[in-house]
Structure formats: C-alpha cells, structure tokens
Regions:
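C-terminal regulatory/interaction module of P-loop NTP-utilizing enzymes
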Residues: 3-276
Length: 276
C-alpha cells in the first residue's frame, strides 16, 4: 500500500493523504518514472546477463549498444558462416596434424579485453533473427557456455548483447529456438517521438559510457530536422515513422539521422523539404 501511494505521488496524481508524510516513507527515493531502456540495458550488461534487444528496423537498437561501448565488436550474423563465427580446423602438411584457427572477431575481443582489463567490452550479435539456423545454434553455445567452439573462453570482461528485427518487420527473419530465446534477458525497444526528440538534442559525447573515457564529439540532430519533427508532433502527426508500402521509402529514426547528416554536410537547411 505504501509503495502504491508513493508511485501515485511521483506520477503527480491526487491523493487525499499528506504528500510529505508519504514521501518520508520512501527513504530510498525510488523514482520509477526515470528508468530508461538504456538504464535497463546497462544494468543487464554490468550484471553479466546476456541481453536481447527487440524492435523494428531503424529503431536504434545498434545505436543504443554503441552508446555504451563505442568499440564494441559487431558481428552481423545475417552474413556469418560457421567458420567466421566458430573458427575452423586446417591441415598442417608439415606436421600432418589439424590446427584449430580462432575466428577473427574472437581474437579482436581478446585483445581489447587484455589491453583494457578494467573496461567492459561488448560482443554484439546483430541481426541474429536473420541468421541461418546453424549459425544461431553456434551463437547459442557461445551465449550458454561463454566459450567459442567449445574450446576458447570469452574474457571475463566480455559481455554479449544480441539484436534482431521483429518477425513481422522482416521477411527473412527466423524464429529463435526456445533454448536460445530463454538464455537472454529481453528488452523491447519502443522509440517514441518524445524519446527521440530528447535523444536528438543530446550531444553524443554526453552519453553515459561503460568506460567513461573521452569520446570524439558528435553532432546532435540538425535543428531543422528537430524542429520539423517537433512541429508535426504538435500537429498531432507522427512524422518520425511512416508505414512502408513497398513502393516509396518510409520514414524511421535511422533515415532522419541520415537526413541530418546531409544538412550538416551541405550546410543547406533549405534541402529539408526535398529530403522530406
């Protein structure tokens, strides 16, 4: 009951009880309204829990991972082969023996983790729902055992994050097997106009990184783009995302970021109308 009353207060709904007294009953200052998707993802990663990000194409799943670890090792499972993901064995004619060759991505992750042992490094399995079933099975073993090909352990400071498009958003998407699905904590990305507008004016160097190192300064979304999306919102029209009809390109958060880059590169904000 006390928890319910506290939640009602923090959402500014009227209660007959004295607000100040109820706030004193919340000594830990819980504020449920300020927990973002990024907070949840970050908490899972720091807790060494493998995370699966769901969402529509262009919703910024990859961008959220890169916010936390700009140097994350991205593995596009759509294009992965068993050899590229799991390594391979080659014959050595000199010794007459088979030699195990580690996959390139694994070598890179090991080097990053060794060079920066106090930093968490993310192994990002992108487009996992578009991967071949055989590749998904290998990814499952990596997530389950924390090792590649049953031979090479992931470093202690490596974490796994995966992402995939919804089945109704990609014709080539495959349903994950139940064991693989259940190995992840699942976060469903929902990019709203309000959350995007907040992100759009946040300088990228202000992101709360996992490593807290100084990053190259990146530009915020171009003011012309921001103003247009905001104006359309007040006109009760969602211009951030439009449905794809199979003929013309649709709008989504990723395409607005592309348009922003064009306006910055050309220095011609009047191009906004043509881009729209």
């Amino acid at each position: 009951k006390e928890l319910f009353q506290t939640v009602v207060i923090q959402n500014k709904l009227p209660l007959k009880s004295d607000s100040e007294k109820l706030k004193k009953k919340n000594p830990y200052n819980f504020d449920f309204s300020n927990v973002t998707e990024e907070d949840i993802i970050r908490g899972m990663i720091e807790s060494d829990i493998s995370v699966f990000l769901h969402g529509m194409s262009g919703d910024g799943k990859s961008a959220r991972v890169i916010q936390l670890d700009p140097d994350c090792e991205i593995i596009y499972l759509r294009n992965a082969t068993p050899d590229s993901l799991n390594g391979k064995s080659v014959y050595n004619p000199t010794s007459g023996e088979m030699i195990d060759v580690q996959p390139t991505w694994y070598k890179k992750v090991c080097k990053k983790c060794e060079d920066e042992p106090d930093k968490i490094h993310i192994v990002f399995f992108d487009e996992i729902t578009n991967a071949l079933p055989s590749v998904q099975g290998m990814a499952f073993n990596i997530v389950l055992d924390g090792e590649v090909n049953g031979k090479w352990k992931l470093p202690e400071n490596a974490r796994i994050v995966a992402a995939g498009n919804d089945l109704n958003d990609s014709l080539s998407a495959n349903t994950l097997s139940e064991p693989l699905f259940n190995r992840f904590a699942h976060v469903y990305i929902n990019t709203t106009v309000d959350s995007w507008l907040k992100w759009a004016i946040t300088p990228k160097q202000n992101y709360e990184r996992l490593d807290y190192v100084k990053e190259e300064e990146h530009l915020i979304i171009h003011p012309a783009i921001y103003t247009y999306i905001l104006y359309m919102r007040y006109c009760r029209h969602d211009a951030l995302r439009t449905p794809y009809n199979g003929e013309k390109p649709n709008a989504d958060p990723r395409k607005w970021e592309m348009a922003s880059k064009v306006l910055y590169s050309t220095g011609r904000p009047e191009m906004l109308r043509a881009l729209i």
